[in-house]
């Protein structure tokens, strides 16, 4: 699934939050978005997800769906989550996210706590998401088993409302719910925030594996340069809403470039 950004601009008062003339995120990329506070990372994600309206420009999702399926039905799902259906001939589509909601069927995201239904327990929330995606109880349990180390015995079966959880555990619930949608586009804003080192390493492994298994397009923003370099095939550096650097990181060559950019002079 490609994400194609053209002439995208968003201002708040006299401040330009995003100003991107042309950016294409290619199908199957695991793209890391980095930049200082106020660089426009979260605003860009909100524009892609149509949570806020752009002043000018478009965000489009382009890909293919199987003949006879709805626009939002997925072509691939992760191993051990859902069985793959026979794949008829693909039909191409090109959707403007601001003018249709079809893209939401294959898009998972966690941007902040407002995405959660906090009067539910984690178990209830996952069951709710499972019903939305026609995921059986057996398939849900298989999904949760893949996240057992990530949950660290603090979420499943605990009967605690999401609103009472720590910031780190809320983060875990949001990430897992986004991935439970079996998305072909996955967008996570600061997924390493509030997580302990074990959980950070676990989610790095899970994201890389999900990308490899499904070919999903994954966008991750983070202030943690090391984690971003570890998982991303491509890294985009934003500053004042503009793309300053666009780095091929398939050989992890972005580390030195980013360290030099963010270096503090003595």
Regions found by a protein language model. Name each.
Residues 49:
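Helix-to-loop junction immediately C-terminal to a conserved catalytic motif
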Residues 34-36:
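The feature captures the beta-strand-to-loop junction immediately N-terminal to the Walker
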Residues 186-190:
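Catalytic Walker B motif of ABC-type/P-loop ATPase nucleotide-binding domains
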Residues 221-223:
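H-loop/switch region of ABC-family ATPase nucleotide-binding domains
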Residues 161-165:
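Conserved ABC ATPase signature
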């Amino acid at each position: 699934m490609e994400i194609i950004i053209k002439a995208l601009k968003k201002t708040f008062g006299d401040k330009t939050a995003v100003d991107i003339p042309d950016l294409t995120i290619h199908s199957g990329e695991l793209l890391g978005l980095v930049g200082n506070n106020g660089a426009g990372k979260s605003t860009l994600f909100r524009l892609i997800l149509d949570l806020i309206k752009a002043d000018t420009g478009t965000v489009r999702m382009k890909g293919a769906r199987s003949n006879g399926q709805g626009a939002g039905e997925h072509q691939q799902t992760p191993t051990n989550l859902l069985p793959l259906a026979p794949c008829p001939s693909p039909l191409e589509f090109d959707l403007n996210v601001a003018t249709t909601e079809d893209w939401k069927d294959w898009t998972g995201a966690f941007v902040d706590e407002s995405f959660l239904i906090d009067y539910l327990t984690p178990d209830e929330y996952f069951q709710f998401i499972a019903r939305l995606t026609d995921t059986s109880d057996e398939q849900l349990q298989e999904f949760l088993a893949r996240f057992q180390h990530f949950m660290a015995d603090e979420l499943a079966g605990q009967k605690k409302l999401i609103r009472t959880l720590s910031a780190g555990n809320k983060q875990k619930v949001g990430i897992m719910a986004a991935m439970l949608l079996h998305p072909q586009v996955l967008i996570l804003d600061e997924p390493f925030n509030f997580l302990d080192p074990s959980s950070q390493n676990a989610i790095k492994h899970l994201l890389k594996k999900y990308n490899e298994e499904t070919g999903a397009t994954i966008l991750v923003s983070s202030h943690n340069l090391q984690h971003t370099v570890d998982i991303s095939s491509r890294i985009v550096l934003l500053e004042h809403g503009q793309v300053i650097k666009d780095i091929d990181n398939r050989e992890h060559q972005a580390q030195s470039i980013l360290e030099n950019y963010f270096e503090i002079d003595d």
